[in-house]
Regions:
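Non-heme di-metal
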Residues: 1-232
């Protein structure tokens, strides 16, 4: 957890001045979750391949996600705004994860985290609150590592697949990524307009997709990065 001193006044300025309370609540809900489904897929994968380090590295990632959710939750709690118990887009992602294997679940996860990187950049640019800016910066640092870790793992999973199957999964991932970007652009337009603007948002989405695609398809994808938190 980040060692913030939460100032109630600065929180109210941020949330009331740029009307982003509902947006932050949605992303806070999205950061929550134990990752039980992907953890189950990861354990099965480890049993099948002997990669015993993967489940613990993945759990370290989810521990960081829980910290993000906790910090964002404290932020909105002190502003006197209720947290969301259920949220439509988060529910859709969870539903889809339960009905895929490890590859599909990681594609959903890396899509959400890649686009979240752009959202937190917009949120950081949209506010003058040092507290919120620092929180966004910390989440961005973590999410960037998560995206690389997940993308490289997808590369390993697809390495032994026939070329047509791998190409079909890549095409499905492109559709998923584009659809998720459209949803975020519509639902979080106030934050994006204040911090980036819609054109720059979609331009950055294309950049993020190229990063993921290069890691999945590139030469360095076969050398997976251990998640930094798993070293501790």
């Amino acid at each position: 957890m980040i060692g913030f001193t939460f100032g109630f006044g600065s929180i109210l300025i941020v949330l009331s001045a740029i009307l982003i309370a509902s947006s932050i609540r949605i992303f806070q809900r999205g950061e929550e979750g134990s990752g039980r489904t992907i953890a189950r897929f990861a354990r099965r994968y480890a049993e099948r391949t002997g990669d015993a380090a993967f489940p613990s590295a993945l759990q370290a990632l989810f521990d960081e996600e829980a910290r993000h959710a906790n910090d964002l939750g404290r932020f909105i709690d002190l502003a006197g705004i209720s947290r969301l118990r259920n949220e439509f887009s988060d529910g859709v992602f969870r539903f889809m994860r339960h009905r895929t294997g490890l590859d599909g679940a990681l594609c959903l996860l890396v899509t959400a985290e890649s686009i979240a990187c752009i959202y937190y950049r917009a949120l950081r640019a949209a506010t003058s609150s040092p507290l919120l800016r620092e929180l966004c910066a910390q989440i961005l640092r973590d999410e960037t590592q998560h995206v690389r870790f997940q993308s490289q793992r997808i590369a390993l999973l697809r390495g032994s697949l026939p070329a047509p199957v791998s190409a079909a999964r890549r095409a499905a991932h492109i559709v998923l990524f584009a659809g998720a970007a459209m949803v975020v652009a519509l639902r979080h337009r106030r934050v994006l307009a204040a911090g980036l603007g819609p054109r720059r948002f979609f331009r950055l989405c294309r950049v993020e997709w190229r990063v993921v695609d290069r890691l999945v398809m590139g030469d360095d994808a076969g050398r997976p990065t251990r998640h930094p938190a798993s070293h501790a």
